[in-house]
A protein has these predicted regions:
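Substrate/ligand-engaging "lid" and interaction regions
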Residues: 1-280
C-alpha cells in the first residue's frame, strides 16, 4: 500500500536483529500502510560484526524483511518495507546521519548484555574496555552509546535540538537504563556534554513483548515451501505483539497509537502487570 519513494527517514535504529524487525519495524510498516507518518521510516545501523552481515543481507533485498507469524492456525507471511537504508558500522556517515535534523528518534535493541551493567550492583559499569575506548576516542565510537553521544555532540555543536533515545529492549525501565549508560559515558568524555544530555535529552521507558526466535535454514525452507518467498534472513515470531511507551518525544513521533501501541505517562504499572502474569 506504499512504496519506498513515499517514505522519508525519521528514525535511526541501532541493532537490527530479529526482534526489532518483528516488532518496531512491523508497527511502522502497518502505520505506513495506513498512509500515516510517512516521514518516520527507519535507517538501520549497528556496532557489532553481525550488524554488518545483517546490513549486507538486507541491502541485497532492498531492505525488505519477510515476517512470518506462527499460530495454531498456521503461518502468515508479510513483507515489510519500513526500512530505507542500512549504514555501514564504524563509518563516519553514521554520526552525520544522527546529526541530520530529520532524525528525531534514535532507537536501539542491543540486548540486556549491551548496557554495560555491573551484575553485582545493577548499575552502569564504566570500567569496561569498550567504554574506556569510546571515552578516549569519542570521534570513532565502538559502542551504541558512544555512537549516540557522537551524534548528540554534533547536534549540540551545530545548534540542532537533540533526538529522543528510545530503547526497545526487554528491560525494566529500559529508558532509565539507557539514560544512565549515555550520561555515564558522557561523564567520562565531557562534563558539559553530560550536563546537556541530562537536561535536554528524552529517554522514554517502554515495555515490549513478542517472542521471536533465531532464524535458521529450517525457517528459510518453510518460507520457500509455504509461500514461495526467498529471503536471506526472514523473521519468524508468535502472533502476539505488544508495545507500551511513555509519550515523551520532544521532536515528535510517529502516530503509532493508530496501529495498537499504547502511549502512557508512566510505563511502570504495565511492567508490574507483565511480571505478575509471567510469575503466576
Amino acid at each position: 500500500n506504499y512504496s519506498p519513494q513515499q517514505l522519508k527517514p525519521g528514525i535511526v535504529h541501532i541493532g537490527v536483529g530479529n526482534f526489532h524487525r518483528a516488532h518496531q519495524a512491523v508497527y511502522l510498516d502497518q502505520l505506513f500502510r495506513l498512509g500515516k507518518s510517512l516521514d518516520w521510516a527507519l535507517v538501520g545501523t549497528g556496532v557489532m560484526p553481525g550488524d554488518r552481515v545483517m546490513g549486507q543481507t538486507l541491502a541485497q533485498q532492498d531492505y525488505l524483511t519477510t515476517v512470518v507469524e506462527q499460530s495454531a492456525a498456521g503461518y502468515k507471511a508479510t513483507v515489510t518495507g519500513s526500512m530505507l537504508d542500512f549504514l555501514p558500522p564504524g563509518d563516519p556517515v553514521n554520526i552525520e546521519r544522527l546529526a541530520d535534523p530529520s532524525i528525531r528518534i534514535v532507537s536501539l535493541t542491543v540486548t540486556e548484555g549491551g548496557y554495560f551493567i555491573n551484575p553485582a550492583t545493577g548499575e552502569f559499569d564504566p570500567d569496561q574496555p569498550a567504554l574506556r575506548q569510546d571515552a578516549a576516542s569519542p570521534e570513532t565510537p565502538t559502542t551504541a552509546f558512544g555512537l549516540i553521544l557522537a551524534g548528540l555532540r554534533t547536534r549540540l555543536v551545530r545548534g540542532i535540538a537533540p533526538f529522543a533515545v528510545m530503547s526497545c529492549d526487554n528491560l525494566l525501565h529500559n529508558g532509565n537504563v539507557t539514560r544512565n549508560a549515555v550520561i555515564g559515558l558522557a561523564e567520562m568524555q565531557d562534563s558539559k556534554l553530560a550536563a546537556w544530555v541530562e537536561r535536554e535529552v528524552a529517554f522514554p521507558n517502554g515495555m515490549v513483548d513478542r517472542i521471536t526466535p533465531a532464524t535458521s535454514d529450517r525457517e528459510r525452507s518453510i518460507l520457500q515451501e509455504e509461500f514461495g518467498i526467498e529471503d536471506g534472513w526472514p523473521v519468524f515470531c508468535e502472533n502476539y505483539i505488544q508495545w507500551v511507551l511513555e509519550d515523551h518525544f520532544p521532536l515528535g513521533r510517529p502516530e503509532l497509537e493508530a496501529v495498537g501501541v499504547t502511549f502512557v505517562p508512566d510505563v511502570t504499572p504495565y511492567e508490574h502487570m507483565k511480571l505478575r502474569i509471567l510469575n503466576a
